[in-house]
Amino acid sequence: MSSKLRLGVAGPVGSGKTALVEAMCRRLRDQLQLAVVTNDIYTQEDAEFLTRVGALEPERIRGVETGGCPHTAIREDCSINRAAVEDLERNFPDLDVVLVESGGDNLAASFSPELVDLCIYVIDVAAGDKIPRKGGPGITRSDLLVINKIDLAVHVGADLEVMKRDTTRMRGERPWCFTNLRSGDGLESVLHFLLQQLPNRP
């Protein structure tokens, strides 16, 4: 039996993907059956971190070592990730959501539709307010765009109004939100998005 939803979380290195996965797990684990697959190039660091902080029970977390280009393992040849997801779904037949966190990649990264149903793409303010207008599949076609670390805008000279304008122009009607995952600001918007995607919402 497959889970109700396979949700990809992608974005550049350091944007806050693992922080978002951790926050979603902590907030939803008491009302949904969750599992996580993480991707790292040569380690299982993100999986080990999520286990160490107790985001979920260890047996619900799988770490995939992709080697080479991280986008290949979520797009061109996603077999290693698909196997990890299917293993979790066999072990936990009542799963509601499997979160698949990609390795850190560039703005061109995207998930294979064979691997996930929907994708959240995470960027961060520290990379500069020009990022939304640079485009790329993550910016323009992800199901939800998360612009994280808004608390750093004043320190890096990023203009949130410019980011808002450019994001709206690039995405049209597709949803997006600002977050500061360290404080929890904006997390409710992400959780609302996820819950709205479930066939039978709790």
From Swiss-Prot:
Function field: Facilitates the functional incorporation of the urease nickel metallocenter. This process requires GTP hydrolysis, probably effectuated by UreG.
Protein's UniProt name: Urease accessory protein UreG
Gene3D superfamilies named among the record's database cross-references: P-loop containing nucleotide triphosphate hydrolases
Keywords assigned: Chaperone, Cytoplasm, GTP-binding, Nickel insertion, Nucleotide-binding
Chain residues that bind GTP: G11, P12, V13, G14, S15, G16, K17, T18
InterPro entries, per the entry: CobW/HypB/UreG_nucleotide-bd (IPR003495), P-loop_NTPase (IPR027417), UreG (IPR004400)
Chain coiled-coil ranges: none
A GO term from the CC aspect: cytoplasm
Subcellular location(s) per record: Cytoplasm
PANTHER family: UREASE ACCESSORY PROTEIN G
GO BP annotation list: urea catabolic process
Molecular function, one GO term: nickel cation binding
Domain of life of the native organism: Bacteria
Subunit structure: Homodimer. UreD, UreF and UreG form a complex that acts as a GTP-hydrolysis-dependent molecular chaperone, activating the urease apoprotein by helping to assemble the nickel containing metallocenter of UreC. The UreE protein probably delivers the nickel.
Chief place where the protein resides: cytoplasm
Family: Belongs to the SIMIBI class G3E GTPase family. UreG subfamily.
